[in-house]
UniProtKB/Swiss-Prot annotation:
The active site is at R176, S225, E296. It comes from Legionella pneumophila (strain Corby). It catalyses: UDP-N-acetyl-alpha-D-muramate + NADP(+) = UDP-N-acetyl-3-O-(1-carboxyvinyl)-alpha-D-glucosamine + NADPH + H(+). It is an enzyme of class 1 (oxidoreductase). PROSITE patterns: FAD_PCMH. Belongs to the MurB family. The gene is murB. This is UDP-N-acetylenolpyruvoylglucosamine reductase. GO terms for cellular component: cytosol. Its cofactor is FAD.
């Protein structure tokens, strides 16, 4: 069946939900972005595998968790979005201080789950506004911790719905970057932490979240850090040194609280506003410091709003 002819019959034997022309703004932490031609919410990993096995091989795919670290353009996405948030959400305590976690589990939930099971080393996940699938994809980290320092093995799936178990040595893992995934996506991971104390870990999480609220614009729509830190420096320091705090384009504003955050002020920004401000910040920093800021955020989709 061609994708243009795909309808609800495509998932007759599936347990998930297939939505058409679905607005994506509500699925992203920036609260911007046009509609997806199709959005699928899988019931579980087996259901996801079945759905993927029936998609046309050339169908554009976008995987979306909490929608942080992503800028969906105003024209939306003309393919199929696979939503993991609220869908692939299983966490299982294993032996040897290990946890198996699915890709749609929020990083904050993972931090609390590990702490409540007297495991330490995962508290930093509480400060990451995304899912574990996204954390695996970019080796997300903060406060001295990185996701891949705990990985024992991962499960991946390809667009044919085929599932593989892979080891860390099969990937090239670096700061905010993981290479070697190919045309596959992370669907779960086995992580090994250290024995700990529940009360100590929960207090550390509480302190981390308090620090985050004090130093980041957590009460405004944002995607998390916009740029990677360059070697030996901080993106926020460079942006602030160029006098860019508070600079705005439309409703998009460089945060006064943390210069490596761009906020959607009171929900008035468009994706085009945010993208233009990202380019402006990169240009000004390059002109004044000769340093090229590299985006952490992924820009996705069609720039032009389509008439449907």
């Amino acid at each position: 069946m061609s994708i243009t002819g795909m309808d609800s019959s495509h998932v007759t034997e599936s347990q998930g939900a297939l939505l058409f022309n679905e607005p994506l703004a509500e699925y992203t932490t920036w609260r911007v972005g046009g509609p997806a031609a199709r959005l699928y919410k899988p019931a579980n990993i087996d259901d996801l595998a079945l759905f993927l096995s029936r998609l046309p091989f050339d169908e554009p795919l976008l995987w979306l968790g909490l929608g942080s670290n992503s800028l969906i353009r105003d024209g939306g996405f003309s393919g199929t979005v696979i939503l993991t948030q609220g869908c692939l959400k299983e966490m299982t305590l294993l032996s040897d201080n290990c946890i198996r976690v699915e890709a749609g589990v929020s990083c904050a939930s993972m931090a609390r789950f590990s702490a409540r099971n007297n495991l330490s080393g995962g508290e930093f996940w509480a400060g990451i506004p995304g899912t574990m699938g996204g954390a695996l994809r970019m080796n997300a980290g903060c406060h001295g911790g990185e996701t891949w320092q705990s990985v024992i093995e991962v499960q991946t799936i390809n667009r044919r719905g085929e599932i593989r178990t892979r080891k860390p040595e099969e990937f090239e893992v670096a700061y905010r970057h993981v290479a070697g995934l190919g045309d596959e996506w992370f669907i779960s991971a086995k992580l090994q932490l250290s024995p700990g104390n529940k009360e100590t870990s929960l207090q550390l999480i509480k302190d981390l979240l308090a620090h985050r609220a004090k130093t980041q614009p957590t009460n405004e729509y944002n995607c998390g850090s916009v740029f990677r830190n360059p070697p030996g420096d901080f993106a926020a320091r460079l942006i602030e040194s160029c006098g860019l705090k508070g600079v705005s384009i439309g409703g998009a504003v460089v945060s006064e609280k943390h210069a490596n955050f761009i906020i959607n002020h009171q929900g008035t920004a468009t994706a085009a506003n945010i993208e233009a401000l990202i380019h402006l910040v990169q240009t000004k920093v390059r002109e004044q410091t000769s340093i090229e800021l590299i985006r952490e955020v992924h820009i996705i989709g069609d720039a032009n709003v389509q008439t449907r």
